[in-house]
Design a protein with these regions (language model features):
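Transmembrane alpha-helical segments in multi-pass inner-membrane proteins
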Residues: 245, 256-321
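Transmembrane helix-bundle core of multi-pass membrane transporters
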Residues: 143-207, 233-236, 255-264, 315, ...
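Cytosolic-side transmembrane-helix boundaries in multi-pass membrane proteins
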Residues: 1-46, 218, 225-232, 302-343
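Short loop segments and helix-boundary regions at transmembrane helix junctions
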Residues: 26-29, 83-88, 109, 126-168, ...
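Helix-loop-helix "hairpin" substructures at the membrane interface of multi-pass membrane proteins
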Residues: 93, 112-113, 117-121, 127-132, ...
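Single transmembrane alpha-helix segments in multi-pass membrane proteins
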Residues: 45-110, 134-141, 275-289, 322
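Hydrophobic core segments of alpha-helical transmembrane domains in multi-pass membrane transport
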Residues: 37-49, 79, 151-158, 192-202, ...
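Hydrophobic alpha-helical transmembrane segments
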Residues: 34-39, 65, 73, 94-98, ...
Length: 343
């Protein structure tokens, strides 16, 4: 008959094995969640490639998909910065409009050097971000209300200074640097977006700023008690989002060679859809750079494939709207599951 000590040892060993099995299953579930969206993207490419091999898999179409969404990638990456800190920025698409319009007005209409027009465009984004932060942090207004109002104001301001006509004739130097010049057959705009993605990934993963954003987003009071300057972090996140939106506006102007009174406004819903869908991939439960990039291209791949199959243009709104609802729901589920698994 085994002794009491031997029996206790066997029990402890069984408990340890059970714990390892549970952790292994949880980690396997986490891995599956992390790669589910990339796998779905690959599956969508294969399906549409089989259905429309002559058009969908053409180098021209693939290059178009990668380059045309560079602006959305930059906007969505900007959006996840305040989202990580627990704030919304509904003015981000309007800042794209402001930036593109300033480049067009100053360069094409007034004849300013393109570099100076771009500098003013970034200054415009900086000012919007600073005002957003001041209203949210210093006065205490909810970021949703502030940025909704700011976005509406900026849109009206652009229509006031630029009129209702499309402004064309932007310098060829910008157009060449964004959409004409290519590397490996893909316009440079795609690579600019990937540089932003790498920088965002590095900041979120390896810097104190990224860790502070995450802590503030998880609990502002806990962050404050930990010595983090919560107001500065939130303010900085709104400024960073506006600066990236300004960069996206410059890319928008370079891509089209013009700016209209609505340039970039259509990016708001897709950016939110990509941000929340991306929070379910790569690093599930967190807004993250590569998940956002994959989400952008997953969504546009689906839309492009459906349109090549004959779907009408309204499928884009249906797709993005449904994706946003699904992504937010799934993101909440993943966060709750991670919280339960970590407990």
């Amino acid at each position: 008959m085994p002794s009491v000590e031997e029996s206790q040892t066997n029990v402890d060993s069984s408990d340890a094995e059970a714990g390892k099995t549970a952790r292994s299953r949880w980690l396997s579930g986490q891995t599956l969640e992390a790669i589910a969206l990339p796998l779905a993207w690959v599956a969508v490419i294969i399906i549409f490639g089989l259905l429309r091999p002559e058009t969908f898999l053409s180098s021209a179409n693939l290059s178009s998909i990668l380059a045309s969404q560079a602006i959305l990638v930059v906007v969505a990456l900007g959006l996840i910065i305040p989202l990580t800190a627990g704030d919304y920025d509904l003015s981000i698409a309007s800042v794209v409009l402001l930036s593109a319009s300033l480049v067009a007005i100053l360069n094409a209409t007034l004849g300013w050097p393109i570099w100076l027009a771009i500098l003013v465009a970034f200054a415009g984004g900086l000012i919007v971000g600073l005002i957003n932060g001041a209203l949210v942090i210093l006065i205490g207004i909810d970021s949703l209300i502030v940025t909704l109002g700011m976005g509406t104001f900026v849109t009206g301001f652009v229509q006031f200074i630029g009129g209702s006509d499309t402004i064309s004739g932007i310098s060829d130097s910008l157009v060449n640097a964004v959409i004409v010049w290519r590397f490996l057959g893909i316009p440079l705009s795609f690579y600019y977006a990937m540089v932003v993605a790498v920088l965002a990934w590095y900041v979120f993963t390896y810097t104190p700023v990224g860790r502070r954003l995450l802590v503030v987003g998880r609990g502002r009071e806990v962050a404050r008690l930990s010595g983090i300057r919560v107001g500065a972090v939130r303010w900085g996140s709104l400024v960073a989002a506006s600066l990236l939106a300004a960069f996206a506006g410059v890319l928008y102007a370079g891509t089209s060679g013009a700016a209209s009174p609505t340039s970039g406004l259509e990016l708001l819903l897709p950016a939110f859809a990509a941000a929340f869908l991306g929070a379910t991939a790569i690093n599930p439960g967190r807004f993250n750079a590569w998940g956002t990039v994959v989400a952008v291209y997953f969504l546009v791949t689906g839309i492009t494939g459906l349109q090549l199959l004959g779907a009408q243009s309204y499928v884009q709104n249906l797709f993005y709207g449904a994706a946003l609802i699904f992504a937010v729901t799934l993101s909440q589920f993943v966060r709750k599951r991670r919280a339960g698994g970590s407990a």
